[in-house]
């Protein structure tokens, strides 16, 4: 493959996934790490990507990748994460399930459970779980975001604040190198904070593409959660925050 073709392919991968690691690109193109680093440096100079230690991300931090594209990426990783999370949730539990394709994977993995009571602001989650007659599903009120089935707004935040549940299953758009949790929509950030504040145990579910991925709104530190479920070892800066705050890390 010519360099220009590889550059175009790298840009498409970054657009599709939001973030790609150097290791992924080396394996994908069967070239040396030095070649990929040169490619990424060239593309960063052209402002086609944002260069990160260990990979590359989208240059824009104001618009999220379309839901259908996110749904189709890292499916195996999301399923592994979902199975591990589901195994930690006893039958009869109460839980929040957040917006996002990884929380949606968790919802699917919970179909083998019984007598769960679930509060969600994710229409896709509700549609998945409604097949279970023994589940009690409470759908939060608010503004429906048609692009991904998320329900957001002040009404959603106030609704969630009425509950105190055993678990909060939380997704996130990006995690900065210092452990900051990043989102694209400040309305969604408020809803996520409400889930954190009203859950006894918060499980953050993220695949490797979220590490180093940019988004515009800072929700706060990853230290706000109780456990992180992911498919790869987080970057050193994030690991330091997890270790210092005794946050449980589960590699799936």
Language-model features: locations:
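HTH-adjacent hinge/linker in prokaryotic transcriptional regulators
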Residues: 2-29, 34-99, 107-115, 119, ...
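Conserved phosphate- and dinucleotide-binding cores of soluble alpha/beta proteins
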Residues: 2-5, 9-12, 18-24, 30, ...
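Conserved SAM/SAH-binding loop
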Residues: 103
């Amino acid at each position: 493959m010519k360099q220009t073709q590889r550059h175009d392919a790298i840009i498409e991968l970054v657009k599709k996934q939001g973030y790609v690691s150097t290791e992924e690109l080396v394996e994908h193109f069967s070239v040396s790490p030095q070649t990929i680093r040169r490619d990424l440096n060239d593309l960063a100079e052209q402002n086609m990507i944002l260069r990160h230690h260990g990979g590359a991300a989208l240059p824009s931090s104001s618009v999220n990748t379309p839901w259908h594209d996110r749904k189709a990426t890292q499916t195996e990783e999301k399923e592994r994460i979902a199975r591990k999370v589901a195994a930690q949730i006893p039958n009869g539990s109460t839980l929040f399930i957040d917006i996002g394709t990884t929380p949606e994977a968790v919802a699917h993995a919970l179909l083998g459970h019984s007598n769960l009571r679930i509060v969600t602001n994710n229409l896709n989650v509700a549609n998945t779980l409604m097949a279970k007659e023994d589940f009690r599903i409470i759908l939060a009120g608010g503004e429906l975001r048609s692009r991904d089935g998320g329900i957001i707004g002040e009404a959603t935040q106030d609704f969630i604040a009425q509950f105190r549940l055993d678990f909060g299953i939380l997704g996130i758009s990006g995690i900065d190198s210092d452990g900051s949790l990043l989102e694209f929509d400040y309305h969604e950030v408020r809803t996520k904070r409400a889930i954190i504040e009203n859950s006894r145990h918060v499980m953050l579910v993220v695949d490797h593409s979220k590490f180093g991925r940019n988004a515009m709104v800072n929700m706060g530190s990853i230290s706000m959660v109780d456990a992180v479920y992911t498919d790869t070892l987080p970057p050193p800066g994030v690991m330091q925050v997890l270790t210092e705050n005794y946050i449980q890390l589960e590699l799936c």
